[in-house]
A protein has these predicted regions:
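Conserved catalytic region of serine esterases and O-acyltransferases that act on ester linkages
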Residues: 256, 260-344
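Alpha-helical cap/lid subdomain in secreted, periplasmic
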Residues: 123-262, 266, 278-280
Length: 344
């Protein structure tokens, strides 16, 4: 893709997004220009996060702006979230796409300035375009669901190739890395049958683990401990997988948290977005869930999308418990105390 077309699309992206003024950024420096050495550097007011991922990233990031707008963003004036999406994308596919400069991605963009509406999107984006679209402060990597469970994912060099490309093309040389862990396969027959891409997808991906969710979780946890948690370059680790599994042990179950074999319901998406929010802002414990309603524009799994989804007190209790238990034990599934649906 030519340079002129890339620049044109970047301008279109900015026009479509229209969520506020982006921080200035030079290739050779961080946000804005170099400050005068005699003047104190101005503290950054906008937090910008980009995830290189898949539909699981879209699920998990979908309501971060909604959560952050409700819960507060500290000293920041704005939080901007970007998600570079390709369906079911694995790390090796990211390598293929960046090598060929393939415009195969969809870029999702959201902001706390528009916390009442879901991300805007733009198609036909390359990884380079996404990296250069903004001065991202945090760039998050994410393996595919099955990739996360095998040693080869962490040792075959693909992660290094992606990181090298990021460092060559990012606009902010001070950007740090994050790592996002996604959920494991559902074992509910109705949900596995609803997988939208291939009727054999569940069998192909989970048969090697004998359809054993606990085993899949253990395989993932072991790799996380050995390859990610021990690597200080991952400043942020976002274990949405743990929170999702915590919530599944509640009365909501798999059907209340997942809308098919792998994707999340609206409540599941909110749980994942709360984990992101807490990790980004260093929240150690939630004392309440301030999101009372999911605006209808955000809804995906709810049948009636003509009106906002009002959360029940039971759902809010499960959300807070699942997230808090994840903050305490990020790699351990903690059974819910809410195993019976409340009378509401």
């Amino acid at each position: 893709m030519g340079t002129i077309l890339k620049k044109t699309l970047a301008l279109v992206l900015a026009a479509v997004f229209a969520l506020g003024v982006f921080a200035g950024c030079d290739k050779g420096g961080a946000d804005s220009t170099e400050p005068d050495a005699t003047e104190p550097a101005e503290e950054a007011k906008v937090l910008k996060v980009l995830t290189l991922g898949s539909s699981s990233s879209v699920d998990s990031n979908h309501m971060i702006n909604l959560v952050a707008a409700a819960e507060g963003i500290g000293d920041y004036e704005e939080v901007m979230i970007g998600t570079l999406y390709y369906s079911g994308c694995k790390l090796y596919e990211h390598v293929q796409f960046l090598t060929q400069d393939s415009p195969v991605y969809r870029l999702y963009l959201s902001s706390t300035k528009t916390g009442d509406r879901p991300p805007e999107t733009m198609d036909d984006v390359t990884m380079e375009m996404a990296l250069k679209f903004n001065c991202w402060d945090i760039i998050v990597l994410q393996p595919g669901g099955q990739e996360a469970m095998v040693d080869e994912t962490y040792t075959n060099g693909n992660i290094g190739i992606i990181r090298k490309y990021v460092e060559e093309n990012r606009m902010n040389p001070l950007a740090v890395y994050g790592w996002h862990t996604i959920g494991v396969s559902s074992t509910d027959p109705e949900l596995t049958a609803m997988y939208p891409y291939s009727p054999n997808a569940y069998a192909e991906s989970a048969a090697k683990y004998n359809y054993d969710r606990e085993r899949m979780l253990n395989e993932r946890t072991e790799r996380m401990e050995r390859f990610v948690m021990s690597d200080p370059s991952y400043v942020y680790v976002i274990p949405t997988c743990t929170a999702v599994e915590n919530a599944i042990t509640s009365y909501l179950g798999q059907k209340g948290i997942k809308r098919d074999y792998t994707h999340l319901t609206d409540v599941g998406r909110l749980i994942a977005s709360y984990v992101w929010y807490c990790e980004l802002f260093g929240i150690e414990e939630l004392t309440e869930i301030k999101v009372d309603t999911i605006p209808k524009a955000f809804l995906k799994s709810t049948v009636d999308k003509s009106q906002d989804l009002v959360l029940t007190e039971g759902e809010k209790a499960v959300i807070m418990e699942a997230v808090n238990n994840t903050l305490k034990n990020p790699l351990k599934i903690t059974p819910s105390q809410y195993t019976q649906a409340p009378a509401e």
